UniProtKB/Swiss-Prot annotation:
It comes from the Bacteria. GO terms for biological process: 'de novo' pyrimidine nucleobase biosynthetic process; 'de novo' UMP biosynthetic process; amino acid metabolic process. Heterododecamer (2C3:3R2) of six catalytic PyrB chains organized as two trimers (C3), and six regulatory PyrI chains organized as three dimers (R2). One of its GO terms (cellular component) is cytosol. The gene is pyrB. This is Aspartate carbamoyltransferase catalytic subunit.
Amino acid sequence: MKQLVSMEDLTNEEIYSLIETAIEYKKGNKPNKFTDKYVSNLFFENSTRTKCSFEMAERQLGLQEIPFETSTSSVKKGESLYDTCKTLESIGVDALVIRHPQNDYYKELEGLNIPVINGGDGSGQHPTQSLLDIMTIYEEYKDFKDLNVLICGDIKNSRVARSNYQALTALGANVKFAAPGEWVDESLDAPYVKIDDVIEETDIVMLLRVQHERHDGELSFDPHEYHEKYGLTKDRYNRMKSEAIVMHPAPVNRGVEIDSDLVEAPKARIFKQMKNGMFLRMSVITHILAEKEEGVIFDVAN
């Protein structure tokens, strides 16, 4: 795996391999340290979980991080994304983690000779979020075939919905969407349903934040009405299968996508997803750098 910009780039075998490595890290297996490697995290959108998770993963792997802040960089002087990245490559950075508001920004970076890991591009792709979600599901079910997955919320503007739909469908899951009519994404070939019609048969309920920053113009939005129609209420939670799970990529708007009392309820896996994120991102970085250097993944001395 030379880089990771889209879930469409991964085969099912590669997905399983990444998950297996992440699980080994989670069990305590020691990584092969990349102490002579440099990484830079370029976040052009706000982030808590993804940015901090990558930073933790990089430290666990022994990588040396070259700090980058958009507010103090030459981007403010009009420098292009490509020239910024080419500059970092030129001074010796070995890999880049990038989040950017532009869909498919990585297509402009094909002239780079170092790997790019996509930390999210507009409403396009969020591959490491999808992989950590898949890891979380795998730990619960060990298989994806015929699992019923319901993704609820702002489908049209969600890179998480797109990445997870593509990956979970390829792995054999049955994916359905629930969303207001104006947030339907017709490019994704999944049925749209009413939550109350399918909640009892669903194995995974995946809730999405409303992407206010990606809506053009004024957004007519009533949080209470949205919660009643598309959120996970206590009644819906109680109607779920006993073994079903609740997921959310976060940040969570309590009382909107999900009742506040349910965020840490027994079926919720929201904070487990966050924990898995560090191990999964360690796995992604390791697979990319180990392949680049033809090295080993685990420290054989441990």
